[in-house]
């Protein structure tokens, strides 16, 4: 199934969290925690400004991002894969390679 976000929404696939501590101990369950990094899968057209223009998003498909995993981030299952739907304002940073 193809999904296209509207307005300033972004579809993100959460990246797996490192399951090993700095000391080499394997972490499981809640000790590993949830990652707040993800890969952008799709972006909307942009945010509508008061003058009617559309401001394009700063993120693009393929970007690795750091996001705020809180209120406003919706979790959905698309083709048996969990994805996150969020506004661009929930994105804190783009990880540059």
Swiss-Prot record:
Residue stretches spanning the membrane: none
UniProt subcellular location: Cytoplasm
Family annotation (SMART domains): Cpn10
BP-aspect Gene Ontology terms: chaperone cofactor-dependent protein refolding
UniProt keyword terms in alphabetical order: Chaperone, Cytoplasm
GO cellular component, one term: cytoplasm
Any one Gene Ontology molecular-function term assigned to this protein's record: unfolded protein binding
Listed HAMAP family: CH10
Family to which this protein belongs: Belongs to the GroES chaperonin family.
Biological function: Together with the chaperonin GroEL, plays an essential role in assisting protein folding. The GroEL-GroES system forms a nano-cage that allows encapsulation of the non-native substrate proteins and provides a physical environment optimized to promote and accelerate protein folding. GroES binds to the apical surface of the GroEL ring, thereby capping the opening of the GroEL channel.
Subunit structure of this chain's protein: Heptamer of 7 subunits arranged in a ring. Interacts with the chaperonin GroEL.
Name recorded for this polypeptide: Co-chaperonin GroES
Organism of provenance: Baumannia cicadellinicola subsp. Homalodisca coagulata
Upper lineage: Bacteria, Pseudomonadati, Pseudomonadota, Gammaproteobacteria, Candidatus Palibaumannia
